[in-house]
Amino acid sequence: MKHVPENIDVLVVGGGHAGIEATLAANRMGMKGCLVTMDKKAVGRMSCNPAIGGIAKGQMVREIDVLGGVMGLAADNSGLQFKILNRSKGKSVWSPRAQVDKRVYEKYVNNRINNTKEITVVEGEVVRLLLRNFKVVGVVLRNNVRIYTQAVVLTCGTFLNGLIHIGERKIRAGRMGEPGAEGLTEFLVSLGLVSGRLKTGTPPRLIADSIDWTKTTVACGDKKPTPFSYRTMAFSPPDVPCHTIKTNALCHDIIYNDLDRSPMFSGDVSGVGPRYCPSIEDKIYRFAHREEHALFLEPEWFNSKQIYTNGFSTSLPEKTQLKALRAVAGLENVEFHNN
């Protein structure tokens, strides 16, 4: 590190959604901020699905926006398709959702952080906190560099002792292809704090050219799209279509027969999963009476050849995933992206 920032008011650990909002919030309050991230280029990177908002989450994005946050603006500037969910119900449960270009979203947020005065971005891994008289006064990086500050905000997300499960295979990582953060959890536990583990899943990414699009149904956004941010004035986003398909009995049988190979059912994973995003194996098990489940094929960026399989979040072995998806009409010859 060429220069260690000084006179920092607020130091934020982690450059995901929460870390970005915390850093910018401190800046709006006139504080000098420092964002420590393991990879400067990954600030604002969307780990999972290429979307902002949705049921429950959409309301949160709006609330963040009212408080001056950047997420709504970033979504409005990178959106490929906008839709209000639950429109058939009362307005209190209407939920805004945007399909976004992951690359444009990341670039927008990265530029916002790097071009804001009084914010310093430091590339490094925080392994412990510095304490003085039971008060946090700074952090220590893995390379032993110390950064002093008035306050520390931890927004490490899935990276704290991150562990990826693919069937019986376990990979230590924050997200696929990126190392997890190790050492900080152990330090916090040594202070008497209790650690727990949450579980989230992600579906395989499909190669667009291996899909038979003629067997899918086009799903467009709203004809009169609504922006997330009240600060967005001019708003004429594209309406890039997604596509829907449905699982079937054969797909369900393939998954059901391999449930014991899913960490959720083998006992390897005991964490609580997100309520509004159950895994495909959980849906097959809990709703055995259902003959089909909807899957949404979503582009990860404009003209993307990498397709996100919304509705097929899973931790099953890769071969089982591929076999189950190839049982679905339109995906008979599907191939996975391996990056």
Task: Tell where the protein language model's regions lie, with residue ranges.
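Long, low-complexity segments enriched in small/aliphatic residues
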Residues: 217-301
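A glycine-rich dinucleotide-binding beta-alpha-beta segment and adjacent secondary-structure elements
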Residues: 308-339
